[in-house]
């Protein structure tokens, strides 16, 4: 547990932005990143506490307006389009996987979300 606590502390020190909201299916969706995108995380938790996480380097494709996060452990990647809405929320479009509407949140949301998922959830990826 102390290793995880250090990880959460490190995340809090690294992250500079966090967005939280819901997918179309009602799942919790949390996106967080540091200034230059070298560390990004996406966490999706469903109503049954099953979760999928992507933690690793993020790249932004300006031409297509997409962000891709490649998970450091699984090497799986998640790509989503980013659209800014009139009410300052963001819509993250993941194609066949659906979309999520998120708003700016405190960094604690990202850290607490990951902590909750690790301690209570079932990893799905």
Predicted regions span which residues?
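Tryptophan-anchored aromatic micro-motifs
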Residues: 1-29, 112-125
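Generic detection of short hydrophobic beta-strand segments and adjacent strand-loop junctions
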Residues: 6, 21, 56, 67, ...
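N-terminal glycine/threonine-rich, aromatic-flanked beta-hairpin/loop signature
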Residues: 10-66
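A structural detector for short beta-strand units
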Residues: 25-31, 54-58, 76-81, 97-103
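Long, low-complexity, Gly/Thr
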Residues: 61, 86-87
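An anionic, turn-rich surface loop/hairpin at beta-sheet edges
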Residues: 65-84
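Short, exposed beta-strand-loop hairpins at the edges of beta-sheets
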Residues: 90-95
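Acidic/charged, solvent-exposed loop-and-adjacent secondary-structure segments enriched in E/D, K/R, S/T
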Residues: 102, 106-113
């Amino acid at each position: 547990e102390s290793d995880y606590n250090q990880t959460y502390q490190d995340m809090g020190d690294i992250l500079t932005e966090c967005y939280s909201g819901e997918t179309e299916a009602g799942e919790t969706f949390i996106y967080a990143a540091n200034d230059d995108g070298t560390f990004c995380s996406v966490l999706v938790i469903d109503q049954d506490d099953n979760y999928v996480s992507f933690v690793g380097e993020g790249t932004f494709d300006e031409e297509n307006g997409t962000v891709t996060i490649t998970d450091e452990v699984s090497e799986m990647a998640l790509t989503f389009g980013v659209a800014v809405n009139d009410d300052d929320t963001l819509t993250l479009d993941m194609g066949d996987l659906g979309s999520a509407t998120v708003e700016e949140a405190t960094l604690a949301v990202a850290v607490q979300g990951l902590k909750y998922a690790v301690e209570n959830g079932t990893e799905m990826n």
